Amino acid sequence: ADNRDPKVVWHPGTRQWIMALYLAGDQYCLLNSTDAKTWTRFQDLSLEDVSECPDFFPLRDDSGTERWVFWGAKGIYLVGSFDGKQFSPETEALICEQGPNGYAAQTWSDTPDGRCIQTSGMAGGQYPEMPFNQQMSIPVELTLVGSGDKVILVRWPVKELEALRQRTISLGPDAITPGS
């Protein structure tokens, strides 16, 4: 079951395809291709205690600098620079998703408005009286907040979900006490 879960993106700066691939254990690699048929492995990466389902995508930070995010199945990620030949992590491993209800997230590329949209699998929650035990998450928009090595990934439900709202409940600043 190793060596799977390819994620392929286009890198316009070098006019080549880039593939993030899970190898085994906590090991991944990056490959490139100009024709999407013949691939060359050019970098190995690891995310400690993370396996499967890599993702690799660009986002701009608060300073406007293009950064690349390397993401593993458990929502652990690295932010760094990528020149088409080398991914250079500029942060330690960061955590964006915790718990069993977010796994194997993937982004959608080339959205018409340039947003980075992500969905993940939800598996592990108990849903009383439901005829299923897994589902997809709602789509979220990803952005980077901060710059340099002080940057984090932020997820927010996509704006299209606002059209589904039917009513709003507002709660005042009441204190919540145990047993109330």
Language model segments and positions:
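Repeated scaffold domains used in trafficking and secretory/extracellular systems
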Residues: 51-56, 102-105
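Structured loop/turn residues at beta-strand edges in well-structured enzyme cores
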Residues: 15, 34-37, 137
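Beta-rich accessory regions
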Residues: 63, 83-100, 108-180
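Blade-edge beta-strand/turn elements of extracellular beta-propeller
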Residues: 1, 29-48, 79-98, 150-156
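Hydrophobic core segments of beta-strands in well-ordered, beta-rich domains
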Residues: 1-31, 41-46, 53-57, 64-74, ...
